[in-house]
Amino acid sequence: MIENPVQLILPKRFGDSRGWFTEVHSVPAFAALGIDCTFVQDNHSYSAPAFTLRGLHFQTPERGQDKLVRCIRGRIYDVAVDVRRGSPTYGQWVGAELSAENGHQLFIPIGFAHGFLTLEPDCEVTYKCSDTYAPQNDGGIRWDSVGIGWPMPVGTTPELSEKDKVQPTLAEFDSPFAYGGRPLAPLS
């Protein structure tokens, strides 16, 4: 079992002259990685401009969401930030490029804020969630308060929603999430 709570998933692609086939989610394969959750909602987002930033979002523990994120068109930089109170890696983050071409996915468990930056125009992202959307449990932290090395040209201001512009900073955030004994580690 892999100990890192956030995991980069590299599904195998089986190709021939017609194209390729891949399994994006398999309960036994995920269980072998230590991922034990049931996904109940699939989300699909489209971002027209390059350097659109969505995040950093979560749902509070009562309706927390494990997420499995993949990019099905274009390229994104996907990030998870540890927001578990008492964690030795609180406030630390990991990120990975996900693209339609590489097929990589990022598993982000409850207790981590999630966000992504589009690296080119016309990106589509799908993600599976372990609970349905609950507006009363919706939360977030500011995208620029954690020290994330967002890969965008110097002087670029990302395209943000009005909601994401006014999220609290990490320093202002009073986390409702508790640490469960698995510190964040670099992705492998």
Regions found by a protein language model. Give the residues of each.
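Beta-rich strand-turn-strand
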Residues: 98-107, 112-117
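Non-catalytic, conserved peripheral segments adjacent to functional cores
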Residues: 1-102, 120-122, 129-188
